[in-house]
Structure formats: C-alpha cells, structure tokens
C-alpha cells in the first residue's frame, strides 16, 4: 500500500519530467531544421535584429531577401550577409521598399519578388522604430509614423504573402514586437500601443492560418544593441532609461538566433532571458499554447510571478517619483 501510495505521488512528477525532456528534444530537432533553398523574407533587414536574422538564415542555407528603405544600407547588409552563406548556390537579394506605402505597391513588389526568388517559406517582420518621450512631448507625426511602421507595415507585408502561404500549405510568419508589448513603460506610451496592437493581430491571424499549415510566431526581444536603440537613447527620458536598464542590453545575434530557433520549432511566443519568460508567463492569457511543457510552467508559475511583477511595478513607480523629485528640485534651484 505504501509503495502504491508513493507511486501515485511520484507519477505526476515523472510525467511532467518526461514531457519537459521530450519538449526539449523536439525543440532541438525542429530548431535545427535545414533551410537549404528556402526563401526567407526579412523586413527591416538592413540593420539591427533584421540583419542578424539574415546572417542566421544564411548560415542555415536559406535564400534571403532583405527589405528596407535605404538602398545604401541594403547594399552594405547584402555584402555582410553574403559572407555567412554556406553554399555557392545561395542567393541574397535586396529590395528597397517602404512597407508603409499603399498596399497595392507592396503587393506588386512581393509578386515580382516571388518570381525572382521563389515562393516565401518565411516572412520575418522586423521593421520598426521607437520615438521615446512623454505623450505630450510626442508629435502627432511621430505617433502616425510609429503606428504605420510598427503595426500597419507588418500587416501589409504579411497580407502580401499570407494567401500564397495558405495555398501552398506551409509557411512561417514572424512578428518582432518588444517586451513593451507585454507591459506599458514610461516614455513609450505610443510605442507600446503599436506593439500591443501587433500582438493582438498575430493572435487573431494565428487562428486564420494554422489549419492551412502556416505557423505564426511573435518575438518579444529586450533592449538590443542596435543602431535603432542608439537613436532611441538620444531622446529617452531618464525614467525610461532607468526602467529599461533592469533587463540589460542584449546582442542582436543572440536575439536573432533565439527568434529563428523558436520560429522553426513552431513556438507562438519567443522571448529572451528571465524577464522575457516572466512577462510571457504573466501575459499568456488566451494566447495560443504551442508547447505542453511551457503550458505546465505557466500554470504553476503565474501566481508566484504575479507577486514578483507587483514588486517590479512598485520599483518602477519609485524610480519615476525619484526622477520627478529631482526635476522639481532642479527647477527650484534655477
């Protein structure tokens, strides 16, 4: 009886361990999938995470199309990504295109691209920008630009390939959002809104395409050492900087490798580091569950993590208040 009782207690833990081990094995197999002759399209591919994704895809044998507005940067990026190719038959193509233009123009460019490079196997929506500042200090022009590029640009580019992917019965659609799509941050009100919108779009799109063999992944990278981040730093409020520093600064190659691996493994959510794991667990809600082991972790950790998140929020509010007091003191002294 004691032995039977012990087995009954241990069985759930053994089952969980088996699920986790199998999930890790499956992840390793799928994330190392060969991309030889597969066509991968990357928007925002001339710099930052987008360019690093180009390197990762090229290392795995893919034919890569880098899309961006600046032709000079595209030429330089093409040269760099070419150096990562592992096969002489690989092709690295560039397309100068503003994905915030009218959809008809984008659609035509993608039709021409398919004739040149073949059907799309994966599209990685990396184009985006952030203008930091309090809402009252953010111009309406900057608000429009952020929503057009961060949200509408990704929607338009995806719309240009989704019908083809569904008809061919396979494909991967990747959206590079931000940890700011999980939590609103001081000085990033509009940016957060645009990334939250992208997350909602991706969840709905996943329902539309999953039965057609098309997978959707949303990546939530932390602060990453890119030219875009360097530009943000120029106008970033002190409050935003202090809050952001709690997650550290990641290298674009590290972030890109994780995004591509998670996408190939069929994960809906891709994060980096402990902060990313905490946020994705807390914000899982009705998001698609594509990994049983991760689902079990969410069930057990969501409660404790909520306490941790409350402590984070108190700390953030303390930082904001501290900055406000310092500013008021400075005003009085002037």
For every predicted segment, state its role.
Residues 207-292:
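SDR active-site lid
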Residues 60-77:
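Conserved glycine-rich Rossmann-like NAD(P)H-binding loop of the short-chain dehydrogenase/reductase
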Residues 126-131:
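Conserved NAD(P)H cofactor-binding loop of Rossmann-fold oxidoreductase domains
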Residues 158, 194:
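Active-site helix of classical SDR
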Residues 178:
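Residue(s) in the substrate-gating loop at a strand-loop-helix junction
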Residues 39, 46-47:
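Conserved glycine-rich cofactor-binding loop
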Residues 134-135, 142-144:
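Substrate-binding pocket helix/loop in short-chain dehydrogenase/reductase
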